Amino acid sequence: MNILLKDFKYPESWNKSPNQSNQYIDQVFEDTNKIGIYELNNQDHYLYVENLLNVTSYLYPTFDKEQLRLCATYLHWLFLIDDFLEDEYNTMSEKQNDVIKSHAQILLTGQYLNSDVDVKPSEKLTMFLQNTSKDWAIKYNKFDVHNIYMTTLFQWLYSVYPLNKTTESTKPIHMDLYTFIRKVNIGVAGSIIVGLLADKDITDIDISKIWLNPIFTRIMENSTIQIGLVNDCASYDKEYANGGHITNPLYFLQVRDNLTFNETLNFIVNKCNQSIDEIIKDEQLLLKQLKDQGYTENQLNQVNIILNYNHNLIQGNINWSLISKRYNNHDGKPFIFENTKSKYI
């Protein structure tokens, strides 16, 4: 049994075509070439960046070229730092802590932890991200959003190793613990807040107040659950082939809870659809609460812009997962999906 794309429920209004602009790929490649990450004339390096960053068009379908560049800078950093931490320091606890501290220092202060030694390319990448965000905040007067953005990335840094360390246990990870870690580790909060930093339309509400609203927090958490599980489905075949499937729920639910593969698939689909239902309910609760607090119709419309950005992430993620070489197996197609239309609510 395969999961069909139509098994995942979405409101029809969430479905958007990818952004047609892709200049941001060349721009980010050139930016990071200056840092020393890539070789400018190396086609393999360029294809690697292209395969990573085409997700930007799916997650941010309504943004202009300048906004796409800002968001792509974040996504590129997220993917590279995640791979760097997992590949280079997966079993070296003391060095793990040192690496995390060095990147955290850059995010929080805009300064290197130890400038007396040679600065690593990965640290230069984090500094470039920090400076890019700060420059945007100055240009558009968004320092509150910039601060939330840096705090969110700081929290994400400390989520990478806890997930990896769950593989050290002789027992499979429990779904509740996995979900708790993935709420931060999947990077959805960063994807939302960088979109809000990039936004040029929200002018009449305080974004930070919406971000701190507990109902909006629950909306984001349900989004992370859904997006994380979709990515797990899309990447399972490749992870299994590479031996990286231990923390994938398609594997550990079978082992821990003695489920068949089909039962595991059904559980994941139901969990995803339940998350979507909860998001829709909470959106109405949030809008009603804000209206009762005196938000005008125009202000509520701007809150809806924020909610729509989240819809774009959810819907764009599953569409990108179908074609992503980051998740797909060797034949270019994730075994878990068939390319059919979404089932709308």
UniProtKB/Swiss-Prot annotation:
Entry's family note: Belongs to the terpene synthase family.
Domain free text: Contains several highly conserved motifs that are important for catalytic activity including the aspartate-rich 'DDxx(x)D/E' motif and the 'NDxxSxxxD/E' motif, both of which are involved in complexing metal ions to coordinate the binding of the isoprenyl diphosphate substrate in the active site.
Induction trigger: Expression is detectable but at low levels in vegetatively growing cells and increases during development induced by starvation. Expression is highest during the ultimate stage of mature fruiting body (approximately 24 hours after induction).
EC class name: lyase
Keywords: Lyase, Metal-binding
EC number(s) reported in the record: 4.2.3.-, 4.2.3.106, 4.2.3.46
The keyword Metal-binding belongs to this UniProt entry's keyword annotation: yes
Motif (DDxx(x)D/E motif): 82-87
Protein's recorded name: Terpene synthase 1
Example of a GO MF term: alpha-farnesene synthase activity
Motif NDxxSxxxD/E motif: where in chain: 231-239
Keyword Repressor: no
Function: Terpene synthase that converts its substrate farnesyl diphosphate (FPP) into the sesquiterpene (E,E)-alpha-farnesene. Is also able to convert geranyl diphosphate (GPP) into a mixture of monoterpenes including (Z)-beta-ocimene; (E)-beta-ocimene and allo-ocimene.
